């Protein structure tokens, strides 16, 4: 199976397991800059040179050898499950993508027809989001009406493939304390170019795709919604130390235990 979703600097200074909706655009640009002294001109997801990616055939053997021998510092980044799925809804369901089209073509018409979701004009964001949550749960639990999408499938699922196939993380940090976490990675590796995290832009490539969130995070999650979120993301809350009880508290409640993550996700 290899290491899907894994990126590595050309210098092999660091390896990163991408988790969608968890600052991956910014992280990719930091990696690129640390090698080249300049940011990639465009969305780093579109880069086909200057950085190794599992999706690029020529990179696969290099990544596989590096990861299985643990030759480089390896990390990933996680995010509060409440804000992550909200972000997925506004970006992927309500938004227009980089190519000027709706995400995955017929997905939004399917949601409008089967789940009664609205995405146009001055729609009821809370009601539509809660219906989207039912859809997300259906895809994850029953794989219908489609397979789960990488942007709302559990973070633990993405992170576990790296472990199960022979990799080990040296660091997993929280998006909510991004500068501190990313700096801890940069401090641990040999890099060709220093990166000033405080001065660099944030490469939030999904920003502006969809409407702005009109309410506080907690307003989107009633008791049923919280139940659905916990059903989907139970392992994410527990392993990455987020507060399930209070959707309004986006900050983690504690430090991530790497040994626990490897033990539970390596099974």
Which residues fall in each region the model found?
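Membrane-interface amphipathic segments in extracytoplasmic regions
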Residues: 1-267
